[in-house]
Amino acid sequence: MKILGIAVVAGAMMFTAGPALAAPIHGNASITCANGAIASGAYRNITVTGACSVSAGAVISVSGNITVTRGAVLDAQSAASTITVRGNVTALSSALLGLGCQPASYVGNSGHACTVDPLDHSTIAVNGNVTALNTGTVLLNGITVRGNITALGGGSEIPWSIKNNTIGRNVSVAGQTTNWLGVLFNDIGGNATLLHIAVTDTDPGAHGAFVVQNRIRRNLVCLGVTPTVTGGLFPGEPLNTVGGRALGQCAALA
């Protein structure tokens, strides 16, 4: 079941070790990562143009923004790290954005284990928004976002996971054609909206998009999701907690 085994994706995305990017001597410089691991340091902005990861145990602070350009990869979900972004994180067309990993024992559910050390966990906070625009893959696991998570378009054969996050405002996911998508165990301060999403996995246990045990302060809205939306694997499981209304295909999931 993908809801229990999303973390296996992390193993497939480990890169051949490249040279680590040295932290700026005086800090607060903007850098571009074309390959390899981003090391501990204080940066103004980080732009990812190739296949980049973060060093295990890295402590990274970004006073501005992180941008993952078209077709690039930011893997901050295979090795545990501490990342603080004062601005926004944006991933563009066909990119892969992976932020956060933690064991099941840390979160109390299936988790998303780090590949480098399955018992370790990330601490990642974004003060602004996380935005994915026609992005190939989005993996957000156990991070804090003070603004919005917005994913418009995109998709791939890699399952998408928005899981165990704390989001200050809204989660909006729309227009994907992707193998699998789960919005799971999140604390959402505003609305959660899923619109016009096609899930292509033919596994009989896939059940379309999963919207499972989220705490949503305002409304939960699901429209045009195919083949369906499900609130869990088994009858009688706890549903989503919604402070406003549950509407559309998610009307019965709260």
Label the model's feature ranges.
Residues 1-22:
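Secretory targeting and sorting signals
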Residues 23-71:
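N-terminal segments that cap or nucleate solenoid repeat domains
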Residues 37, 50-53, 58-60, 72-73, ...:
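Small-residue (G/S/T/A) turn/hinge positions that recur once per unit in extracellular repeat modules
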